[in-house]
UniProtKB/Swiss-Prot annotation:
The keyword Membrane applies. Residues 323-333 have a biased composition (Low complexity). Residues 1-21 form the signal peptide. PANTHER family: GLYCEROPHOSPHODIESTER PHOSPHODIESTERASE 1 (PTHR46320), PROTEIN CBG16011 (PTHR46320:SF4). It is found in: Membrane. This is Uncharacterized protein T09B9.3. It comes from Caenorhabditis elegans. GO terms for cellular component: plasma membrane.
Length: 340
């Protein structure tokens, strides 16, 4: 309702400006600039837009990707973003692993979802803490509670012939340089893709590397609703609603992904429909579905539409393997949950 009201006010203001422009020269100039703005934006779009990956590594990656485990399978005392979680995912049928990649203050890459870790004595923010300190934290509890390094995770996936999707929650040029060097060193262009929410990060990734597969994660309520709760108050909620409106129509029209050179869209099951999937495919963009919870959703998107899917719990959704009852381990540290 509020976004529609804002658009209505904008249209009324432009109409009022047009009426006043009949009398005032300055307003005629302003109105002319406003009316030529769409033309200028169209020209800039055509000149600055980036192309998605055209090489064969795109087909190779997606031909080998169908069941994607969301940070591994966390059953029993196993935690996500750990080697045991990756191992359980492989045993339960996954062919690809999503992992969160962050960089410490001294340039060490680690696999961790939250941007900080709380202990009884202090809070450690990842990009402000050295690896020597992070490596001593027992984040998950038990005997294997230390943080997994990026190189360890990649080595395991390579040894077990698993494709990888590296999710970048926090972007930096140093992080991108490390990822590119790792890909070139191990020849991983047909085994790796990166994903991000950040539009600026997506643009910088494509400008830097035209072979690296890049995906954009999006959801129609990404900014206005977090963990089922509305963001902001009665005075600021309109801003988050406007951001969601901008993102929604930017994605649905394919303007944003086409401009950034995105190779695939990671779309929530609530926002996915056949029209978007077909239009994306016609534009050279693949679709990956996430947030699936029912067998009906799985049958439609995975079996009928033949789309790759990101699965949080392979056992419950696909009925693969057996998981032991979940028993939360004791832990001396607690992770501050961040937006996945």
């Amino acid at each position: 309702m509020i976004p529609m009201l804002i658009w209505f006010i904008v249209i009324v203001l432009i109409a009022l400006l047009a009426c006043l422009a009949i009398k005032f020269l300055a307003l005629r100039i302003v109105l002319a600039l406003l009316l030529t703005l769409p033309i200028l934006l169209s020209v800039a779009f055509c000149v600055l837009r980036r192309s998605p990956v055209q090489e064969s590594n795109k087909a190779v990656f997606f031909n080998a990707t169908s069941i994607i485990s969301d940070r591994g399978e966390a059953h029993g005392s196993v935690h996500k973003n750990t080697i045991p979680a990756f191992r359980q995912a492989k045993q339960n049928g996954a062919d690809t692993i999503v992992m969160d990649v962050r960089m410490t203050k001294d340039g060490m890459l680690i696999v961790l979802l939250p941007d900080s870790v709380d202990t009884d004595n202090a809070t450690y923010i990842v990009d402000e803490t050295h690896w020597i300190q992070m490596s001593q934290l027992n984040v998950y509890g038990g005997n294997n509670g230390t943080i997994l390094t990026f190189d360890e995770a990649v080595s395991w996936c390579e040894a077990n012939k698993m494709n990888m999707i590296w999710h970048i929650p926090s972007f930096s040029s140093d992080l991108l340089t490390y990822l590119r060097n790792k890909i070139m060193q191990d020849s991983l262009y047909d085994k790796v893709a990166v994903t991000t929410y950040n539009l600026i990060a997506a643009g910088r990734i494509r400008c830097t590397d035209r072979q690296l597969l890049m995906g954009m994660i999006w959801k129609s309520t990404e900014y206005s609703i977090v963990n089922g709760t509305a963001v902001g108050n009665m005075y600021t909620s309109w801003y988050y609603s406007m951001m969601d409106t901008f993102t929604y129509w930017g994605i649905r029209s394919l303007l944003l992904p086409s401009f950034l050179g995105v190779d695939f869209l990671v779309t929530s099951v609530d926002d996915a429909d056949r029209a978007l999937i077909v239009e994306s495919s016609a534009s050279g963009m693949r679709t990956i579905i996430y947030d699936m919870e029912t067998a009906t959703e799985r049958n439609y998107f995975a079996n009928q539409m033949e789309l790759p899917m990101i699965v949080n719990d392979l056992v419950s959704l696909l009925g693969t393997g057996n998981s032991s009852p979940t028993t939360p381990p004791s832990s001396s540290t607690k992770a501050n949950k961040n937006r996945s």
